[in-house]
């Protein structure tokens, strides 16, 4: 069974979000505060989406059910089968982890690149800004489902103190803890980490044209990923925009290196400007060729008037 977080984003080149139904136990209870964890997967790779996930439950359910019985941790420390098994216990109707709600936003390579490549550069929508906005939209979406959040734990993007202040100002009344390595420190962040990682991994797999295709880890430092980029680079458009983040320096370098074998593209504005400049130069040259020398007027005086 494909996770609903994946189904919501399959085949779309644009950013999509998914919000699970709120577990009825969370809407009915008042005896334990509701806590949330937030984490991402895929911030650094040149391939595939960046996925943000939130997971929430009651403090009591976390302490009495999740922590004693399930091995949630930083998703990078878990094997792929373990991650998928843990997430399946949340989204499948198997009567296991029934009191965990979750939501995801998959920021596609197209939207990441578009945000980071605006002109002029002062208008760039950098990755931190995109991450902050998506995080706040996810929190807001859960609150709009009538979930009364008490405490939110966030794996940091940028300096923890300034980010925490930003979140507290946006959501007064909700307590925030923003920390580095939060996915190893707080259980609900670990749950969110697993949700984000599994969702991203399956989405990246879906991008393969051949099941045996080797993409590598997706990171620009991975020789297998760089080899895939070189192998699949086309002379006109580079790579599919739904797979590759063109704003990454790795892509810029490969495009520049291949410029001799690539098809040059001139935008209409550039073409019109070049024609206008050429016409102006031609006109100036013609004026220079046909211009007649200016005759100086003879100075008339009265020197010889009486002779």
From Swiss-Prot:
EC class of the enzyme, as a word: hydrolase
Organism encoding this protein: Saccharomyces cerevisiae (strain ATCC 204508 / S288c) (Baker's yeast)
Effect of substituting residue 39 to A: Abolishes enzyme activity
Cofactor descriptive note: Manganese or magnesium. Binds 1 divalent metal ion per monomer in the absence of substrate. May bind a second metal ion after substrate binding.
Other comment: Present with 623 molecules/cell in log phase SD medium.
Lineage: Eukaryota, Fungi, Dikarya, Ascomycota, Saccharomycotina
Protein name: Ribonuclease H2 subunit A
Subcellular localization(s) per the UniProt record: Cytoplasm; Nucleus
Boundaries of every RNase H type-2 domain copy: 33-260
Quaternary context: The RNase 2 complex is a heterotrimer composed of the catalytic subunit RNH201 and of the non-catalytic subunits RNH202 and RNH203.
Family membership: Belongs to the RNase HII family. Eukaryotic subfamily.
GO cellular component: cytoplasm; nucleus; ribonuclease H2 complex
One GO process term, biological-process aspect: DNA replication, removal of RNA primer
Reaction equation(s) it catalyzes: Endonucleolytic cleavage to 5'-phosphomonoester
InterPro entries: RNase_H2_suA, RNase_HII/HIII, RNase_HII/HIII_dom, RNase_HII_hlx-loop-hlx_cap_dom, RNaseH-like_sf, RNaseH_sf
PANTHER family per UniProt: RIBONUCLEASE H2 SUBUNIT A
Cofactor(s) essential for the protein: Mn(2+); Mg(2+)
Catalytic activity, EC: 3.1.26.4
NCBIfam families membership: ribonuclease HII
């Amino acid at each position: 069974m494909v996770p609903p977080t994946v189904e919501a984003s399959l085949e779309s080149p644009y950013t999509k979000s998914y919000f699970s139904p709120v577990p009825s136990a969370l809407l009915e209870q008042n005896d334990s505060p509701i806590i949330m964890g937030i984490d991402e997967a895929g911030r650094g790779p040149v391939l595939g989406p960046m996925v943000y996930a939130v997971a929430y439950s009651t403090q009591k359910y976390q302490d009495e059910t999740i922590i004693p019985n399930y091995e949630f941790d930083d998703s990078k420390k878990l094997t792929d089968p373990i991650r998928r098994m843990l997430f399946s216990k949340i989204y499948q109707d198997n009567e296991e982890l029934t009191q965990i709600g979750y939501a995801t936003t998959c920021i596609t390579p197209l939207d990441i690149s578009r945000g980071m490549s605006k002109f002029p550069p002062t208008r760039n929508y950098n990755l931190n800004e995109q991450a902050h906005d998506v995080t706040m939209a996810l929190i807001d979406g859960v609150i709009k489902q009538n979930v009364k959040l008490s405490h939110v734990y966030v794996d940091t993007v940028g300096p923890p103190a300034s980010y925490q202040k930003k979140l507290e100002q946006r959501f007064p009344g909700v307590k925030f803890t923003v920390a580095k390595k939060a996915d190893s420190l707080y259980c609900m962040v670990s749950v969110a980490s697993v949700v984000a990682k599994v969702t991203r991994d399956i989405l990246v797999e879906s991008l393969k044209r051949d099941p045996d295709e080797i993409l590598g880890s997706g990171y620009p430092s991975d020789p297998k990923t760089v080899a895939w980029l070189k192998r699949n680079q086309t002379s006109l458009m580079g790579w599919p925009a739904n797979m590759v983040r063109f704003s990454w320096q790795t892509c810029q370098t490969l495009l520049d290196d291949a410029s001799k074998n690539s098809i040059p593209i001139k935008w209409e504005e550039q073409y019109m400007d070049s024609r206008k400049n050429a016409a102006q130069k031609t006109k100036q040259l013609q004026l220079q060729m046909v211009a007649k020398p200016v005759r100086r007027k003879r100075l008339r005086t009265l020197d010889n008037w009486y002779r």
